[in-house]
Amino acid sequence: MGYKEIYNEWLTNAYFDADTKAELERIASDENEIKERFYTDLEFGTAGLRGIIGAGTNRMNIYTVRKATQGLANYILKSGNAEKGVAIAFDSRRMSPEFAQEAACCLAANGIKAYVFDSLRPTPELSYAVRKLECIAGINITASHNPPEYNGYKVYWEDGAQITPPHDKGIMDEVKAVTDYTTMKTMPAEDAKAAGLYEVIGAEVDDAYIAELKKQVIHQDAIDAVGKDLKIVYSPLHGTGNIPARRILKELGFENVYVVKEQELPDGEFPTVSYPNPEAAEAFELGLKLAREVDADIVLATDPDADRLGVRVKDKNGEYHDLTGNMSGCLLADYEIGQRSALRGLPEDGYLIKTIVTTNMADAIADYYNTGLIEVLTGFKYIGQQILGFETSKKGEYLFGFEESYGCLIGTHARDKDAIVATMALCEAAAYYKTKDMTLWDAMIEMYERYGYYKDDIQSITLKGIEGLAKIQEILETLRKNPPTEIAGYKVLKARDYKADTIQDMQTGEVSSTGLPTSNVLYYDLSDDAWLCVRPSGTEPKVKFYYGIKGTSLSDADEKSAAMGKEVLAMIDKIM
């Protein structure tokens, strides 16, 4: 059927509820809007679903959630592990509780038990719950840091990580095979509960999760010594982090935690920010205002699903510095690996894991501590996959993993990035350095002096709709057919094409495999430890240009990064 026929089917079929039909009636005269909503199904990709909330096959609604869940249920039933059940969590967004219940009711109608959190919870706790409850899978209703009109649906497998091969393709195929909405199963929530197929979970999982985080503390002595003096400003950005982040800090002994009141309570409209993203300066405006009032040492903000952490740290002159995800990740990697090395030594087969778009300072840290370094595709699920590989092969030990987009994992209690454990560890590190009369900024400067003045940045273009998607593909194909030989004065040493699974040495012409799964990503290794990577976003209508350089000082790094940024923008303009 064409999009107009599908639109009419949704308008007239008794299966669809009155609110859905009323919403569709309101767009009856808007042909473009009808087409956008019905020209395709909302794609269930490797990251699950993510889209604008609304009626239509290309929108997030109870029917597209039911379709995704029916496909997942079919896959689970074929796997033979349906009796293990599925854990379900949700965030503070519009319709998140409703979508979580819809998923649970669909699973129950298929004979699969759902364990549903009683209220909003962080993404990492869902990952932990899958493992703790020994479920076959997990569902998380969240769109992370997207604008308020979005919501999403992420699927986790039994190891607690987001789905990777072969499960991702298997589930995607099952979801695609569900073509008739009226055949999808569901049942009333009360009936599911009465049948023992819908169990509400909460405090017992919270307590176990917090206990796991506490196991990662290295220097409780430092917290005991100065934790009561350290001043911390924290914002959950209207999301899920408020209760667990403040709980862990209080229980460890951090007494001066100031929450940003305007952003404390869950609110899917995110009224104080246009974009609830801890990478954005806007997200810190209220936090920094409070920090200056109370003279805080550090300012922290977690994104709405509390898997990513933004950081500002105060130097000894009272100035606050923004730590990018690369900087905070390296600060934590150096602290965690360095302190464990000093206290009890490191395992011979220990590994630091990073994504391909993450700073090369990580490589320098791994070299310094003589640990292995593993590079994976963008997406924390690939770090989770490596941890599973260590466990199943009994070879290799996880030390730390992070990605440039403000996410890391300390410990293996979860298999997704965890901003609650990161909040805990960063405050612990601040306490430790405070006992040495150092700030976190002092520690960062010390790292630059030891490893090099690395600076990394990103430029992105937003291209929405059908035409935008085509343009994004055109940009990648143009670069693929005409690879640059020089970028911003840096020679291209190697060109990696993850879609073609090739690494070409630009000097010798030799071609080798990337050793990673195929992905529509281009990467250029440049001279002087610089690099550039181009990839479409997996969650937003964007194409992203990541790049990094290494300078001889902070000012030199700033200059080189600015020059690289200008060159990247010029490249984009030329292609566009």
Model-derived segments and spans:
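Glycine-rich phosphate-binding loop plus the immediately following alpha-helix
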Residues: Y156-T186, N326-D349, K354-A362, A419, ...
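An N-terminal, well-structured beta->alpha segment
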Residues: E5-A103, A192-K228, T240
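Phosphate-binding and adjacent anionic-ligand microenvironments
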Residues: R292, A296-I298, E319-H321, Q339-R535, ...
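Gly/Ser/Thr-enriched, mixed-charge loops and adjacent short helices
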Residues: E33-L42, N151-E285, L290-A291
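Short Gly/Thr/Asp-enriched flexible loops that form oxyanion-binding sites at enzyme active sites
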Residues: F99-L107, Y150-W157, D307-N326, A362-I365
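Conserved phosphate/anionic-ligand binding catalytic regions in large, soluble enzymes, centered on
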Residues: F38-N58, A143-N146, I232, P236-I248, ...
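N-terminal small/polar loop signature for handling phosphorylated ligands or for N-terminal nucleophile
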Residues: A87-Y150, K250-G310
